[in-house]
């Protein structure tokens, strides 16, 4: 195994070759984690944006199962599933299918278009330039984070994130956007393991087999993660499980990992030295 690969695996915490029995154990472990954290913080609810993708569908169902468990114990708790489209989402029916599977305590739709377009206009007025599609995509992700914290802020709920090992290693999230959350119940799982957990939870193939997409770009709606990364999730997952992958793919993945280190840390201070290495 490559030296950096071993280091990354220790950091990400992925267990190789997960079986269905182990997946069921992981479901239970993560439901209990959510319950324990809600009780420890005194919070009475959770908020999560639901896109219809694999990760938010899995995290959403785990949240609802945790909330159901606490309610059965007499501790009134709720899960608010938030739809956060920019205008009209091209795969809206997938999001609705995810909501039917999750069965959240309540759901609401917060369309971010007006906020993002207003920022777009203000940006042009301030800089004299048109915001790039990529930069605007990050604005969308951060607007969604703001919306979720606004929904959570009134009742004092916690915001749930969907980051997992296959996204963390690549830094494939927006800093202070979808990377902003109070708890990450999918940490330590890779993409195929997220799919496996959804399967053992009874999700339809339409949900667990959906091609992952951040869907942030106006110019390329629905562009897949794999196309954007130039790597496949099977390659990333194999690497995270300690398996050998194509040399060029491994080198590219490690380069992306090193380049995105700043996303996996708190803001750098004068006392930090990791960035010097």
What are these regions (language model features)?
Residues 28-31, 96, 195, 233, ...:
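Generic alpha-helical structural signal
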Residues 2-170:
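ATP-dependent adenylation/nucleotidyltransferase module used to activate substrates
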Residues 213-251, 258:
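Long, well-ordered amphipathic alpha-helical subdomains in the mid-to-C-terminal portions
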């Amino acid at each position: 195994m490559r030296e950096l690969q071993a280091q990354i695996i220790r950091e990400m915490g992925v267990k190789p070759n997960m079986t269905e029995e182990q997946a069921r154990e992981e479901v239970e472990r993560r439901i209990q984690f959510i319950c324990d954290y809600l009780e420890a913080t005194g919070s009475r609810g959770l908020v999560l944006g639901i896109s219809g993708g694999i990760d938010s569908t899995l995290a959403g169902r785990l949240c609802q199962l945790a909330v159901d468990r606490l309610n059965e114990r007499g501790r009134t708790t709720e899960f608010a599933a938030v739809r956060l489209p920019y205008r009209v989402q091209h795969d809206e029916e997938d999001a609705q299918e995810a909501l039917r599977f999750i069965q959240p305590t309540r759901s609401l739709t917060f369309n971010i278009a007006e906020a993002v377009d207003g920022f777009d206009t203000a940006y042009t007025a301030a800089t004299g330039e048109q915001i790039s599609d990529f930069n605007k995509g990050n604005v969308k992700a951060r607007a969604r984070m703001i919306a979720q914290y606004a929904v959570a802020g009134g009742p004092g709920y916690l915001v749930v994130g969907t980051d997992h090992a296959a996204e963390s290693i690549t830094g494939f999230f927006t800093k202070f956007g979808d990377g902003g959350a109070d708890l990450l119940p999918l940490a330590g799982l890779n993409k195929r393991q997220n799919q496996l957990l959804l399967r053992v939870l009874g999700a339809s193939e339409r949900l667990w087999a959906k091609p992952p997409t951040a869907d942030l770009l106006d110019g390329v709606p629905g562009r897949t993660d794999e196309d954007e990364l130039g790597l496949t999730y099977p390659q990333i997952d194999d690497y995270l499980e300690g398996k050998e992958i194509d040399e060029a793919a491994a080198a590219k993945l490690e380069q992306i990992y090193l380049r995105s280190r700043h996303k996996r840390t708190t803001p750098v201070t004068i006392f930090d030295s990791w960035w010097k290495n």
